[in-house]
Amino acid sequence: GHWGKPFIIFPSSRGRYFDYEGMGMIEAIAGFINAGKIKLFCVDSVDEASWYNYAVSAADRNARHEAYDRYIVEEVIPFVRHHCQSPQERVMANGCSMGAYHAVNFFLKHPDVFEGTIALSGLYRLDRPEFQLSAAELPGVYFNSPLSYLAGIDDPWYLDLYRRSKIIVCVGQGAWEDEAIEDTRRLDSLFREKSIPAWIDYWGHDVN
């Protein structure tokens, strides 16, 4: 895009930066892009080396993700701001599936950098079976498991920024969405408990 609100697009599980276009998402929102309302910055993931790298310890997986976190915040964000000619610009985070996890996690950890999130069909806790983390390992990844750490956030600095942000979380109700529905409901509950405005949308039973 040539102008508009910047979005960082996180790919789905083990995905690449070009997947968003390959899955038809660019075409679907082309009207907004061409009208100068939004501009997209699609990034690679390191899921294969972090949360899905079952060959290494939880600590190593967490450390790899933290390196990715620094890359996004310290390198990608400055690039986006320079590109937008807006040195204080807060960007939006967007993603589907594992990309939704990243979109929510980055927003919650860095609300001074991210203005909000649009997350679609994500899992928001790292104790899900697909991540293969034991109960003993979970404390070491606590601060990257949104449904874990969000419950304990009471710092007014974070809460005030959350309440002034744009939060949209959607999930289908079709096949394979059970865990995503459960996590979305829990996220919705936590937002309500903390008086954080959010648009939570449950799509049809034909959507997955």
Q: Which residues does each PLM region occupy?
A:
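Non-catalytic cap/lid and distal C-terminal segments of serine-dependent acyl enzymes
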Residues: G1-N208
